[in-house]
Amino acid sequence: MWPLRFNNRFIAVLPCDPEVSLRSRQVLEAWSGVAPTPVPVPCLLAYSSEVAAILNFDAEELVTPRFVEVFSGNALYPGMQPYAVNYGGHQFGQWVGQLGDGRVITLGELLGADGVYYELQLKGAGPTPYSRGADGRAVLRSSIREFLCSEAMHHLGIPTTRALSLIATGDTVIRDMLYDGHPAPEPSAIVCRVAPSFVRFGTFELPASRGDIDLLRRLVEFTIMRDYPHLHGAGETLYVDWFAEICTRTAELVAHWMRVGFVHGVMNTDNMSILGLTIDYGPYGWIDNNDLDWTPNVTDAQSRRYRFGAQPQVAYWNLGCLARALAPLFSDAASLQAGLERFRATYLAAERRDAAAKLGFAACFDEDLELFDALRTCMHQAEMDMTLTFLGLADWEPNMPDSLSLWAEAFYDPVKRDAQAPMLRDWLQRYAARLSVDPLPVAERHERMRLANPRYVLRNYLTQQAIECAEQGDLIELHALLEVMRRPYDFQLGREAYAMRRPEWARSRIGCSMLSCSS
């Protein structure tokens, strides 16, 4: 591990805010130098051994006082140069201007064991010039959610930022969890999150909105140089290729979300990664009964802009915002349309690929998409758990005596189950007919479905149970969840409880079905 050699390319290349203070202000440059605010009693709650290994941390270092001091913001390793990044964004469809890292401080980059440079950020590290009067801290509940979901998504095979550590600060902050006029003290924590880049769509939108074409161009050139080094060429041709790849990655990302039933909850353009990573875990969730209109975010309860079924369309809209921000760099902005068309084509291809895999087909034809959509309709009307429905289907054979027995654990409402039983049996007959002409051998079909349909997903009620235990000083559930989510596609003996459908007590419970951006 030693010596750690930190690189700081973002701040070495891009212009710095000349003012050195925490005063909230409009910043015209790309970043501001700012140090983390120390915390009173830091305590390591959890860490990811896989991320630590990638970053070349020795296992012994992870439990030392020095590690805890650094990743709580109380100290720095040599070579770290902390800073906060400036960006803007569209939130819930409206341009809101400058946002920036209001409670995130980047420490620098480390060269990983895989040959990739990774940025290390502390989320909840204290105020910055972008905090807009807030305290720059993060509560324990949201920090646990980000830590666990970062790692769970990675092991599901979904592009994501990662998490190195979760550290309690020993302090409390005041938060109004549901924005309903009931603020209360909550314990705070800091997550060290890790990614090759945290550049967002909003990074480019802000200078474009201000007419600062020089900074816009410098940001684009830097991002291509650092994050897309495989792209070659110059000028508009290079920019077109770059934007098209962003569109491709974003389409693949959202297709993965739809495959596993993940709902991001707050797909603002400042929460969209330029690398096509899942970023900024807030009021996210996994759908239970396949309701395309469901969102876990109470802030979005009326418009449901970021509901599960709308995520592909929202991603496309966000890419349109990015295209408009980049347009000043082009003599003919129409060339960006090819990238947007790339998104459509990539998403449709990924949708077909994933439908075939989830149903166990060798390939997906048009009528297979109709069959897939029909199953989604059945799941919704019968109130069936999406994860358990596909899991049961992977073990089904046409000669089973009771065709619905495979879904015994998937139903949330026995009345709806009985009412929709004829429709479900009809669907299974259609499915059996399709399987009879598919070339995949049975064993290969089962394996294909197993790899596409997770057994374990990070259901909100599981996370909430871990949060409530951790708030009382019990970390057993936190560590158990972290371990289970490392192998989401495998049967894990003794871990069956983590694969169960949402219990009835969690249907309308805060933290389980209702979340907010309060963190």
From Swiss-Prot:
Record key words, sorted: ATP-binding, Magnesium, Manganese, Metal-binding, Nucleotide-binding, Nucleotidyltransferase, Transferase
Active site residues of this protein: D270 (proton acceptor)
Chemical reaction(s) catalysed: L-seryl-[protein] + ATP = 3-O-(5'-adenylyl)-L-seryl-[protein] + diphosphate; L-threonyl-[protein] + ATP = 3-O-(5'-adenylyl)-L-threonyl-[protein] + diphosphate; L-tyrosyl-[protein] + ATP = O-(5'-adenylyl)-L-tyrosyl-[protein] + diphosphate; L-histidyl-[protein] + UTP = N(tele)-(5'-uridylyl)-L-histidyl-[protein] + diphosphate
Binding site for ATP: G100, G102, R103, K123, D135, G136, R193, R200, D280
InterPro entries for this protein: SelO
EC number of the protein: 2.7.7.-, 2.7.7.108
Keyword Acyltransferase part of the UniProt annotation: no
Cofactor(s) for this UniProt protein: Mg(2+); Mn(2+)
Gene Ontology MF, one: magnesium ion binding
Similarity field: Belongs to the SELO family.
Family matches, as NCBIfam families: PRK00029.1
Listed PANTHER family: PROTEIN ADENYLYLTRANSFERASE SELO, MITOCHONDRIAL (PTHR32057:SF14)
Entry function: Nucleotidyltransferase involved in the post-translational modification of proteins. It can catalyze the addition of adenosine monophosphate (AMP) or uridine monophosphate (UMP) to a protein, resulting in modifications known as AMPylation and UMPylation.
Name this protein carries in UniProt: Protein nucleotidyltransferase YdiU
Record organism: Xylella fastidiosa (strain 9a5c)
Gene expressing this chain: ydiU
